[in-house]
Amino acid sequence: MIRTFADNASEDLFNGVDSRRARSACPRELWPIVRRKLTQLNRVRDLRELAIPPGNRLERLSGSRKGQHSIRVNQQCRVCFRWEEGHADEVEITDYH
């Protein structure tokens, strides 16, 4: 379950709000995919559930994002988050590369 968002843009996308912040977070054509990924993240109770479907490409991040995980939206866009006590915290949509 999602507990917190890292920014308002990601929260707007999750809630289906068409805001300037949401438009700056990722291209509009990706919004349906982003919402589907965020809904999936909100439903899981165990991090391993995000490994299915394989297209999510669940990853543990390193470097400046150590402690975070990500699932893939497309080649560049990711949903990044911290997984703690069965919940997703600091959820954000980002161009990871």
Model-predicted segments: where are they?
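A short, surface-exposed loop/turn module that caps and links secondary-structure elements
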Residues: 45-69
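Short, solvent-exposed, low-complexity loop/linker segments
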Residues: 26-54
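Arg/Lys-rich, positively charged N-terminal/basic patches that mediate binding to nucleic acids
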Residues: 1-37
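Glycine-rich, flexible loop/turn motifs
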Residues: 1, 9, 46, 54-57, ...
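Enriched for short, Lys/Arg-rich terminal
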Residues: 62, 69-97
